[in-house]
Amino acid sequence: MTHLYAHIRRAGAALTLLVSLSSICSCDDGAIEEHHQPTQETNTYTLRFCANIKGVSSWNGQYSVALACFDSESEYAKTVKTLHDTDADEDRDTILLSGVGTDISTVEVAILSPLRRRIATIASFKISADISDSDTIVIDAGDIEADMFVSINRFVFQGNNCSRCHSGSSPASDLNLSADVAYSNILNIPSVKSPSTLRVKPGDADNSYLYRIITDENIGSHYAHTGLFTDAPQQAFIDIIKSWINAGAK
């Protein structure tokens, strides 16, 4: 009888342990499930971004083009997704981005620093402030040109007022930097100020007049072009231009 009672006690203890372990496993499974299914407390939603993106593969150096989410308070992206060129046999890419916070105000195809600071915005899409975490936001962005030189042309030659002096029938230093002719007027063309130096010498930024005039205050120009690059995003384009030239200026 004593032996039978001992067996019953051991069986009861084993059953209690089994129930306890089962409870632990159930809690773990529940936590994992909740982690992957956002609730009202997570304040996030899913973004579906559709676009035909070209030129991303032309980028080199420390700066890159990415799909980035920004709030209204900071120049640093809160969520980032790496981009690639849309394949030739595809109409457009579809990019899914989950866990996007409801504090995000814009979704951008942007040039970013290694620390995810916005250098320039290639395309921007405003997010409504009244979204809920159960929403899936769909953005059809159409065609986006993200080529490295196209960005230099847009944000430096045109956006930084270079073409104000370097355009028209009598451009400064006989250099027309209007958007449609800027590339052909700088590549392998001797500088008027320094005929022995090419404006852009592919593969050699240090010996390209374009790079030298924006980095050297003593180059001899009557206008200090270094003054065009004063804040951090503009200064970043000095490195971007250098990387573009050293990679072959394509």
Predicted regions mapped to residue ranges:
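Acyl-donor (CoA/ACP) binding surface of acyl/acetyltransferases
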Residues: 96
